[in-house]
């Protein structure tokens, strides 16, 4: 069994360099919610050095709230903004001799595209226009995954180690209780259940079916790094290979 392990980088966290030794894919902020040309260049350089797959992490234009504010933008605006961000990272990557492999939206853009078909279509269309060979990463079972498939893109369905799930397989909103899993044992058990058995227990107790093709690691600091190492160790014990 194989699983991709991804992390969102270039967002001002101090643990990026160490995380790049533990993950197989990096989602690099493209300036709309965090990061700038210099951080993008530095993250790409480190990812290439560690053999980590490079991906764009486009967002709504929302640096004030770290891309976590809901926005109702016209699909054509989202298309143009997504195209812009992907293009910037692709060029920076190419200039350093690398190849960009995937795209994963950030924050509220990701969450809204999971449920809003028009928004999902705009993102998938932008990815396809940039490069039909790019992989589109989205929440397992979401509208974004469906849109990607409609454009003939390779999709990668994502699950979260440290997020609570609702009965329909969607994430518990960050504004609600149960959105974040603080207990390391619970997060580890949830991740293994999703990867090995394709299901997750919701905060209301029901089992939801999920397809786990990539696992997202969140957080900064030693706690996040320690959990990443523990997860890698657990995967190794179960014979699960970490690879993009």
UniProtKB/Swiss-Prot annotation:
It is an enzyme of class 3 (hydrolase). Pfam families: LamB_YcsF. One of its GO terms (biological process) is carbohydrate metabolic process. Keywords: ATP-binding, Hydrolase, Nucleotide-binding. One of its GO terms (molecular function) is ATP binding. It catalyses: 5-oxo-L-proline + ATP + 2 H2O = L-glutamate + ADP + phosphate + H(+). Catalyzes the cleavage of 5-oxoproline to form L-glutamate coupled to the hydrolysis of ATP to ADP and inorganic phosphate. HAMAP family: PxpA. Forms a complex composed of PxpA, PxpB and PxpC. This is 5-oxoprolinase subunit A. The gene is pxpA.
């Amino acid at each position: 069994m194989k699983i991709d392990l991804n992390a969102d980088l270039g967002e001002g966290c101090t643990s990026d360099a160490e995380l790049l030794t533990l993950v197989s894919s990096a989602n690099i902020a493209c300036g709309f919610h965090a990061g700038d040309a210099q951080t993008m260049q530095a993250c790409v350089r480190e990812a290439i050095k560690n053999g980590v797959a490079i991906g764009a992490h486009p967002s709504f234009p929302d640096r004030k709230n770290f891309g976590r504010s809901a926005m109702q933008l016209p699909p054509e605006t989202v298309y143009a903004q997504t195209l812009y961000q992907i293009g910037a990272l692709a060029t920076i990557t190419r200039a350093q001799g690398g190849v960009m492999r995937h795209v994963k939206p950030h924050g509220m853009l990701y969450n809204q595209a999971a449920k809003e078909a028009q928004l999902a279509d705009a993102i998938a269309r932008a990815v396809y226009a940039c490069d039909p060979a790019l992989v589109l990463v989205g929440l397992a079972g979401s509208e974004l995954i469906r849109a990607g498939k409609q454009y003939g893109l390779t999709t990668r369905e994502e699950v979260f180690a440290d997020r609570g799930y609702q009965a329909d397989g969607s994430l518990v909103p960050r504004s609600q209780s149960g959105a974040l899993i603080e207990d390391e044992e619970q997060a580890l058990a949830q991740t293994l259940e999703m990867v090995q058995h394709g299901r997750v227990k919701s905060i209301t107790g029901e089992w939801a079916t999920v397809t786990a093709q990539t696992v997202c690691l969140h957080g900064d600091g030693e706690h996040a790094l320690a959990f990443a190492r523990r997860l890698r160790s657990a995967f190794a014990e179960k014979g699960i290979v970490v690879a993009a």
